[in-house]
Amino acid sequence: MIDDDGYRPNVGIVICNRQGQVMWARRFGQHSWQFPQGGINPGESAEQAMYRELFEEVGLSRKDVRILASTRNWLRYKLPKRLVRWDTKPVCIGQKQKWFLLQLMSADAEINMQTSSTPEFDGWRWVSYWYPVRQVVSFKRDVYRRVMKEFASVVMALQDNTPKLQSAPAYRRKRG
């Protein structure tokens, strides 16, 4: 389903843990990493597509996460010309995305990249919040920057509410 401007409706998913780190997934058989994302099917809402993609790509269900935020607007990126499939009709020149920020409520062990017969990812790790902006492929970088900027206050508030380990008072020797 491509819109009149040539953009495919899509959802993007940022999953964070209680420490404010985000899940960074490695594309199957590649050295590139990204957030989970996927197309919205006809008749499907963005939220329904997000839950479907969450299960297909990461193996998590509704009970494993909670929605913390979603982007106010659709965000777009253009594909590099070398990635556009010019022989398809209509031609898709890029993606328009609605992004969701989710908090993982289950254990990390619930994450399973192999639920689909054609997995999108073959690995994942927790990374610092801003890390993906510097590491994603260049044509997605502006969208990632905008998404992370929009979600930053929510994730930082989450970090502020995480109990911190108390360090033992430092031992000081009296002088004199």
Swiss-Prot record:
Q: Which UniProt keywords apply?
A: Hydrolase
Q: Which Pfam families match?
A: NUDIX
Cofactor needs:
a divalent metal cation
**One MF term in GO for this entry?**
mRNA 5'-diphosphatase activity
EC number(s) in its UniProt entry? Answer: 3.6.1.-
Q: Which family does it belong to?
A: Belongs to the Nudix hydrolase family. RppH subfamily.
Protein name in the entry: RNA pyrophosphohydrolase
- Superkingdom of origin: Bacteria
Q: Which InterPro entries match?
A: Nudix_hydrolase, NUDIX_hydrolase-like_dom_sf, NUDIX_hydrolase_CS, NUDIX_hydrolase_dom, RppH
Give start-end ranges for motif Nudix box: 38-59
What role is this protein assigned? Accelerates the degradation of transcripts by removing pyrophosphate from the 5'-end of triphosphorylated RNA, leading to a more labile monophosphorylated state that can stimulate subsequent ribonuclease cleavage.
Q: Which residues form the Nudix hydrolase domain?
A: 6-149
Q: Does the keyword Hydrolase belong to this entry?
A: yes
GO biological process terms on file? mRNA catabolic process
Q: Which GO terms describe its cellular component?
A: cytoplasm
Q: Which classification does the entry list for the species?
A: Bacteria, Pseudomonadati, Pseudomonadota, Gammaproteobacteria, Enterobacterales
